[in-house]
């Protein structure tokens, strides 16, 4: 998206009545730069990174970014941190990909000791972790506000809540596609999920969730695609989102996929869900 489309996205999300806007970090905009722009183009919207790569900047810089944005924009920024993927870390950034949990724990310790604002305790910072497996979930509950798992089901949400305990934030991501045409929805899901089915951390988590190897071959089985990308009527989509909430999520991050398979956010489904 260019700057005009990003500003329009923030304005529309806020106008529809949503409380937050989340974005990823890959090879486009740098996380803190984009967060500042989105915050500047909204009034009350909470902006979160989903997620900022810990290999993209050192822990002191992350502490500065988190503390600075929250000071400038009245505590409207959430820093979601993640270890990303081997290919992004080693092939694109040229770093060595470490063991996920130990690397994240070390990063958080450095962030805690950064000394940017001596009056701000680590537990008071708006930091959550991209966590899928139980050990990263445990770290998220122990060191931060909570977790933001990606591409999961309501059953997973219930299990994650059990690991996190009752107090930690649990913000789960859910892809949706507003179409009642099965073939259309499945085509969108295949296009969306194909990129993720080659990354070990997601594959391992989906296997833990009960999917079989056959479900995760190629672009994914119909069973897998329907579980990860919810499609159908507004009522059906809303019901699936509510399943996450009743399973223990505090917040559901909706990724609205366009039914025609084009890139970008599907505003009609966001507007429809906002009215529910």
Question: Can you say where each PLM-predicted feature lies in the sequence?
Answer:
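Active-site-adjacent structural elements that line small-molecule/cofactor binding pockets in enzymes
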Residues: 1-276
């Amino acid at each position: 998206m260019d700057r005009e489309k990003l500003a329009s996205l923030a304005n529309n999300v806020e106008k529809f009545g949503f409380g937050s806007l989340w974005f990823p970090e890959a090879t486009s905009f740098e996380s803190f730069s984009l967060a500042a722009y989105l915050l500047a183009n909204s009034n009350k919207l909470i902006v979160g990174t989903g997620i900022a790569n810990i290999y993209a900047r050192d822990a002191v810089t992350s502490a500065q970014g988190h503390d600075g944005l929250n000071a400038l924009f009245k505590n409207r920024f959430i820093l979601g941190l993640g270890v990303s993927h081997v290919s992004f870390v080693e092939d694109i950034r040229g770093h060595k990909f470490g063991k996920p949990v130990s690397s994240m724990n070390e990063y958080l310790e450095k962030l805690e000791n950064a000394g940017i604002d001596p009056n701000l305790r680590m537990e008071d910072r708006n930091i959550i972790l991209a966590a899928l497996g139980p050990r990263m979930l445990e770290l998220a509950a122990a060191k931060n506000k909570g977790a933001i798992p990606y591409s999961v089901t309501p059953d997973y949400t219930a299990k994650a809540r059990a690991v996190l305990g009752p107090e930690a934030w649990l913000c789960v991501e859910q892809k949706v596609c507003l179409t009642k045409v099965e073939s259309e929805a499945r085509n969108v899901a295949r296009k969306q999920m194909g990129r993720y089915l080659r990354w070990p951390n997601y594959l391992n988590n989906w296997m833990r969730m009960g999917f079989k190897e056959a479900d995760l071959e190629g672009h994914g089985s119909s069973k897998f695609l329907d579980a990860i990308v919810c499609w159908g009527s507004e009522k059906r989509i809303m019901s699936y989102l509510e399943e996450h909430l009743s399973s223990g999520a505090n917040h559901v991050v909706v990724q609205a996929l366009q039914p025609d398979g084009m890139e970008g956010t599907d505003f009609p489904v966001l507007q429809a869900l906002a009215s529910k």
